[in-house]
């Protein structure tokens, strides 16, 4: 998984602030630390055996989505689209056949809270 500058900035802020729980709109979110980020991709970018789950098919996990944490109430993934210069942040319901992202903010809003 390639490391993006904004993701690196987020991880650095988490490390220095020691804060991993934030609120973004109505969502309470746990953010992954540097040590948790790679493991946090399991079940989304790839399975536990490192087999890719990425596909360009509609409703499948996209290459440009990086999981940065999870919504603490339901455990749904919180992820950023690294191909968009605004670095929008989404969540989507786990356990469904298709991923249907819901926009909840952007990465700069998260960084400002740390």
Regions found by a protein language model. Give the residues of each.
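Intrinsically disordered, low-complexity regulatory segments enriched in Ser/Thr/Pro
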Residues: 80, 85-97
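Generic hydrophobic, helix-prone segments enriched in Leu/Val/Ile
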Residues: 9-14, 89, 111-114
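Short conserved micro-motifs at the rims of enzyme active sites and ligand-binding pockets
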Residues: 78-81, 101-103
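Compact, glycine/acidic-enriched structural inserts
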Residues: 92-114
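A surface-exposed partner-binding patch
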Residues: 1-79
């Amino acid at each position: 998984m390639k490391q993006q500058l904004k993701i690196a900035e987020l991880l650095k802020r988490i490390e220095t602030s020691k804060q991993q729980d934030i609120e973004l709109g109505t969502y309470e979110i746990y953010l992954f630390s540097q040590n948790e980020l790679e493991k946090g991709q399991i079940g989304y970018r790839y399975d536990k055996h490192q087999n890719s789950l990425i596909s360009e098919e509609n409703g499948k996990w996209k290459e440009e989505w990086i999981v940065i944490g999870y919504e603490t109430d339901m455990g749904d993934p919180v992820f950023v689209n690294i191909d968009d210069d605004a670095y929008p942040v989404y969540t989507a319901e786990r356990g469904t056949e298709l991923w249907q992202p819901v926009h909840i903010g952007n990465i700069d809003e998260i960084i400002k809270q740390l």
